[in-house]
């Protein structure tokens, strides 16, 4: 509805979007009663002046304020293409999203030149929630703030984001930051932004801390993330829980830092699959030649090695692959 005035004035229209990420928020939250009223009026005018054909009336359903521009134009587009290049993070950062949502089609442009431990980190605090309110975890919040203090003391110039599944945890971390003596430094120098998986679309940070909140005895992540994505057509259903997972795990540029209160093996459903997939990349030992082992007279060897390290086959089987 917002784009309609521009659409009727255009000679050519280029629509960019991704059905596996969130659609326009205002359209998603549009009032159903008002929307249905407009649709009923539209059907009446269409039947009286254009056609009563059932197929055409079915297509008329796309004239819906909750239908995204992307969905609307997919029915009548002359040409479609998928943009496969990923410029934000390293191959290891995007491997899960590429495999799960894009059939391993994403191609990370940036080549990792630092150890895997410097681009992915898992911290298990082995903590059980006690007096926290609702879906919050004070231990994880305090741990992340200590890491921010360390970044400041090391005088590291980076941008930082914090992403959590729960609004309660977002509020808790925000409250602790607001009371912190280094609040201004965090916000101005580190460009700190505290987000949920629902509010991080369009954002990117060099270091992203994930506060998962869940513990052994209290885990409500099934309300946030999908149970299982196997055999599910994400294009067809536009599952918001799946979109949430795809968006949240693709915001990082340099380092993913997962802060948890239990081991990755204890997480259930699809978020457990995601964490274990990324953890396997982080924990696996690389059995590849070092740069010093390559032939200095063959500069392409280094590039070929980097290309091989980006392949889905290698990322999923690092422990089993040895290259000499």
Where are the model-predicted features located?
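Helicase C-terminal subdomain and adjacent C-terminal extension
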Residues: 25, 29-81, 220-323
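Conserved helicase/translocase motor-coupling segment
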Residues: 100-178
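Structural recognition of the conserved hydrophobic beta-strand(s) that form the central parallel beta-sheet
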Residues: 12-17, 258-259
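Short, conserved "post-DEAD/DEAH" coupling segment immediately C-terminal to helicase motif II
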Residues: 2-12
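Conserved ATPase-coupling elements of RecA-like P-loop NTPase cores
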Residues: 1-4, 24-27
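Active-site glycine-centered loops adjacent to acidic/histidine catalytic or metal-binding residues
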Residues: 18, 83, 202
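Conserved helicase C-terminal RecA-like lobe
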Residues: 153-161, 170-190, 195-250, 262-267, ...
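Coupling/hinge elements of helicase-like and P-loop NTPase modules
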Residues: 75-121, 263-265
């Amino acid at each position: 509805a917002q784009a309609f005035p521009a659409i009727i004035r255009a000679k050519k229209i280029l629509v960019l979007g991704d059905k596996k990420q969130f659609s326009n928020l205002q359209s998603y939250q549009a009032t159903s009663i008002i929307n249905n009223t407009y649709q009923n009026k539209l059907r009446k005018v269409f039947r009286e002046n254009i056609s009563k054909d059932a197929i055409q009336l079915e297509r008329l359903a796309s004239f819906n304020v909750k239908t995204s521009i992307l969905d609307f134009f997919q029915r009548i587009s002359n040409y479609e293409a998928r943009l496969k290049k990923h410029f934000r993070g390293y191959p290891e950062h995007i491997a899960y999203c590429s495999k799960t949502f894009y059939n391993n089609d994403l191609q990370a442009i940036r080549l990792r030149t630092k150890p895997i431990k410097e681009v992915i980190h898992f911290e298990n605090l082995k903590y059980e929630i006690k007096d926290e309110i609702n879906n919050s975890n004070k231990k994880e919040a305090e741990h992340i703030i200590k890491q921010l203090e360390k970044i400041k003391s090391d005088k590291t110039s980076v941008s930082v984001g914090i992403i959590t599944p729960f609004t309660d945890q977002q509020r808790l971390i925000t409250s602790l930051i607001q009371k912190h003596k280094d609040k201004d430094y965090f916000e101005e120098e580190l460009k700190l932004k505290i987000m949920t998986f629902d509010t991080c679309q369009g954002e990117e940070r060099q270091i992203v801390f994930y506060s998962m909140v869940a513990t052994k005895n209290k885990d409500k992540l099934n309300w946030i993330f999908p149970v299982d994505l196997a055999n599910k057509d994400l294009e067809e259903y536009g599952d918001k829980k799946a979109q949430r997972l795809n968006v949240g795990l693709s915001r990082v540029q340099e380092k993913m830092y997962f802060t948890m209160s239990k081991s990755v093996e204890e997480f259930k459903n699809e978020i457990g699959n995601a964490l274990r997939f990324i953890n396997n990349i982080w924990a696996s030992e690389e059995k590849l030649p070092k740069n010093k082992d390559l032939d200095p007279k063959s500069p392409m060897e280094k590039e070929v090695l980097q290309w091989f390290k980006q392949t889905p086959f290698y990322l999923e089987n690092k422990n089993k692959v040895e290259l000499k």
